[in-house]
């Protein structure tokens, strides 16, 4: 029976770098990963990207950056708690401490949304719809079927791997040059768009252009290969995923109350089974005299702590199945029934009350129109470069290409690579920049 080994899974070697880091007082390789991520421009731009509510005028609701920071905090706690319990395993590397594992998961959590386009998951769907229409008109005929799938099923997770390993810092030479362990902890869907799982789950983790990077990471870490460019998950991915689930299930509801979409009483009733009445830090129970924001904040902290403990315990109990690459579903499914119900009920309330709200529909329709305008201009310009035989492109295409900066494709690249670089540019946009650019392309110059 094939089993993954912790001493390989926790590899501190950096991708794109032939030698190991010199020991540095006060910073392990995994803490350096965190620092590289948090100082990167791609991470900084998350501050102006949608979490759930596009272009909200309420500064109290979450964006991708605040969400990612909160997820990373929960992920760090999960990583430390799990490692404290399993570090006695025979193959556990002596140089890896629980706080190192916390830093790995924390870094993976920081990066988990780094490839998302403007306007959040709706932006992903809008891009897919645009390419489906473009493809129906013969626009992608210069690409192979597998290459077409990368665009027809545009995926922020695959774009995220590309951002981490290709685009930031050392462009196309390892990118951020993160450790293999952190990259493995980030790889939520270690397969390509042509894999049947990509269709059934609607997710995949690497583009055709980056499949050898996926293979390099998987082979270095000793992930179990399940098919052609298809591996099982790194066990720590489950902690990153749990941290994300915990945060967005609870925080989405808090934002819903802030925006007046949900009643505070509904959220309190949903979360109350975990802890009953929540006490103030000074020992006073919460009453109607407290502001709802304080009441929810105190309850949120208690709920998250409970869910972290439940997921950490589930990981410890399922460790061997995780190392065999056999665990089905997510960690929440193996947590205690109370934790499962809280997460499930919170997600259901968000779907029914928040994601279907009229204000969200209005903002998403506007976002779709803006992305369509941007794609209408940049994609044909990129394909013109890909088809160019005489070093000349049209005057209009030159103008679009000039706006792409370092992402501008060079004459002579394949149409597919030209489109990948174009999507690097578009996916990296913030909501605000996309709004401004779409307006300018529409003639709204003043």
Question: Residue spans of the language-model regions?
Answer:
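Acidic, low-complexity proline/glycine-rich segments
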Residues: 31-44, 335-339
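A residue-level signal for conserved active-site and pocket-lining positions in enzyme catalytic cores
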Residues: 160, 371, 426
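Sequence-structural signature of the catalytic-core scaffold of metal-dependent phosphohydrolases
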Residues: 1-26, 38-49, 69, 73-74, ...
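C-terminal subdomains that position terminal phosphate/3'-OH groups for nucleotidyl transfer/ligation
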Residues: 278-417, 429
């Amino acid at each position: 029976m094939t089993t993954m080994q912790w001493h390989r899974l926790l590899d501190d070697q950096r991708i794109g770098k032939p030698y190991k880091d010199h020991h540095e007082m006060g910073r392990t390789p995994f803490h350096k990963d965190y620092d590289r991520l948090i100082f990167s421009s791609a991470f900084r731009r998350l501050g102006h990207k949608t979490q759930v509510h596009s272009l909200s005028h309420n500064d109290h609701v979450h964006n991708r950056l605040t969400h990612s920071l909160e997820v990373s905090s929960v992920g760090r706690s999960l990583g430390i708690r799990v490692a404290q319990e399993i570090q006695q395993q025979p193959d556990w590397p002596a140089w890896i401490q629980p706080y190192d594992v916390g830093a790995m998961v924390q870094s993976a959590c920081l990066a988990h949304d780094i490839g998302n386009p403007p306007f959040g998951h709706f932006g992903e769907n809008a891009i897919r719809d645009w390419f489906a229409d473009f493809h129906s008109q013969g626009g992608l005929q210069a690409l192979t079927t597998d290459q077409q799938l990368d665009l027809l099923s545009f995926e922020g997770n695959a774009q995220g791997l590309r951002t981490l390993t290709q685009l930031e810092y050392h462009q196309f030479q390892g990118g951020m040059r993160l450790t293999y362990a952190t990259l493995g902890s980030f790889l939520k869907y270690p397969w390509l768009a042509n894999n049947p799982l990509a269709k059934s789950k609607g997710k995949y983790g690497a583009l055709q252009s980056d499949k050898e990077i996926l293979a390099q990471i998987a082979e270095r870490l000793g992930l179990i290969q399940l098919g052609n460019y298809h591996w099982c998950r790194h066990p720590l991915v489950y902690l990153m995923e749990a941290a994300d689930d915990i945060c967005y299930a609870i925080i989405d509801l808090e934002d819903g109350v802030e925006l007046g979409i949900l009643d505070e009483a509904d959220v309190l009733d949903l979360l109350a089974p975990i802890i009953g009445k929540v006490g103030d830090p000074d020992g006073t129970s919460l009453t109607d005299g407290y502001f709802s924001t304080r009441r929810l904040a105190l309850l949120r902290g208690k709920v998250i702590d409970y869910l972290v403990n439940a997921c950490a315990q589930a990981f410890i109990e399922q460790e061997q199945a995780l190392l065999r690459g056999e665990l089905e579903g997510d960690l929440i499914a193996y947590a205690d029934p109370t934790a499962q119900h809280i997460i499930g009920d919170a997600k259901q309330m968000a779907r029914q009350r928040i994601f279907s709200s009229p204000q969200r529909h209005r903002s998403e329709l506007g976002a779709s129109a803006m992305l369509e305008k941007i794609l209408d201009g940049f994609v044909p310009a990129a394909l013109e470069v890909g088809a160019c035989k005489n070093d000349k492109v049209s005057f209009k295409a030159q103008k679009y290409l000039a706006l792409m900066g370092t992402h501008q494709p060079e004459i002579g690249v394949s149409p597919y690579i030209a489109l990948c670089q174009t999507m690097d540019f578009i996916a990296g946009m913030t909501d605000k920049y996309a709004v401004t650019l779409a307006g300018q392309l529409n003639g709204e110059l003043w």
